[in-house]
Amino acid sequence: MGDPKSQARSRRDFLNRGYYAPLRDAMVELVRKQVSGRAASTNGPMTLLDICCGEGYYTSAMGAVPGVDAYGFDLGKEMVRLAAKRGDAAYFVANMKDIPAADGAFDMVTELFAPFNEREFARVLAPEGSLYTVVPGARHLFGLKEVLYDTPYLNDEKLPKTTELELVGMQRVSANITLQTQADIEAVFQMTPYYYRTRPSDKERLANLDTLQTDIDFIIAEYRH
């Protein structure tokens, strides 16, 4: 499985280089729109919870939006420790199966690439709130798979199925990026499920690369009560 501290730092360094900035910026814009569209008569900041926040790359960016009080949690202690250094949000260690928050506590809930716990997500979301979930698009990291596999395949674009929340909107965020170092290639590989199910002989194909061009492709879905 590797060293959790090393993997957390590797993930942080990769994201800090801006490869996934298009997704970060799209999430920030959604938060800005929520704040600007809030009724003028409503007092106080909007509350946001980022589920499985990792090392806080997206959380801190969303939390920096004026008028937002952001919180993020992760099961990994090292992830939370790194996230706390970013600021612009309050971070804590928790399990998504039992989120330590009151019913309806958050105006916005965000969940990027994490398992979908319908019951808990719906519970902590305010009655008029929005839940944003992010899943990989069909061509996400296709360039990586072209190197790893003789017959690369497109991702199934599977949105979470839920009976407690209603899908009200979707948007795609896509770009083409060039990973500039072997460390970046290895870091993004470790962030994918392919890392754990790819044969060692196929992994060696990546080890010989110094740069890699690939699509990134995300789907952001909005759910409400």
Identify what each model region corresponds to:
Residues 97-109:
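A short acidic, Gly/Pro-enriched loop at the edge of an enzyme's catalytic core
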Residues 47-98:
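Class I SAM-dependent methyltransferase SAM/SAH-binding core
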Residues 106-120, 135-137:
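A short SAM/SAH-binding and catalytic strip from SAM-dependent methyltransferases
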Residues 33-47:
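Short helix-loop-beta connector
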Residues 128-139:
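Conserved beta-strand signature within the Rossmann-like core of class I S-adenosyl-L-methionine
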Residues 2-26, 30:
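Class I SAM-dependent methyltransferase Rossmann-like catalytic core
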Residues 145-167, 173-225:
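Conserved Class I S-adenosyl-L-methionine
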